[in-house]
Amino acid sequence: MNTVRVTFLLVFVLAVSLRQADKDENRMEMQEKTEQGKSYLDFAENLLLQKLEELEAKLLEEDSEESRNSRQKRCIGEGVPCDENDPRCCSGLVCLKPTLHGIWYKSYYCYKK
């Protein structure tokens, strides 16, 4: 009976120690894989960040060009001389030949429609 207990105890201790060794080995493998994964993730993160910065720079460049080109030109107010070929009268005004005043200064002025 004693030999059965000793044998059982020996097998039990051996199984526990092997299981512990397997756990340690698995833990080391997992740690190595996570370290490799972290380096890969860092590389991927840096690459993505670089691409996003390039995209942001392009978008900001387009926005600045667009805002420069789309700025509304200054318009000429009512009763101000204008050019017949290039009228820059504000909205609601038309470049017309004056009826009485201003005939001697310039030939066209901005008037209400």
UniProtKB/Swiss-Prot annotation:
Q: Where is this region: Disordered?
A: 61-83
Note the superkingdom of the native organism: Eukaryota
* Propiece residues: 22-74
One Pfam family of this chain: Toxin_22
Give this protein's Gene Ontology molecular function annotations: sodium channel inhibitor activity; toxin activity
- Intrachain S-S bonds: 75-90, 82-95, 89-110
Major location (coarse): secreted
Which tissues is this protein detected in according to the database? Expressed by the venom gland.
| Compartments where located | Secreted
Its GO CC terms are:
extracellular region
Does the keyword field hold Secreted? Answer: yes
Task: Give UniProt keywords alphabetically.
Answer: Disulfide bond, Ion channel impairing toxin, Knottin, Secreted, Signal, Toxin
Which stretch is the leader sequence?
1-21
Domain notes, please? Answer: The presence of a 'disulfide through disulfide knot' structurally defines this protein as a knottin.
What family classification does the UniProt entry report for this protein? Belongs to the neurotoxin 14 (magi-1) family. 01 (HNTX-16) subfamily.
Q: What does this protein do?
A: Probable ion channel inhibitor.
Q: What is this protein called?
A: U11-theraphotoxin-Hhn1a
Species per Swiss-Prot/TrEMBL record: Cyriopagopus hainanus (Chinese bird spider)
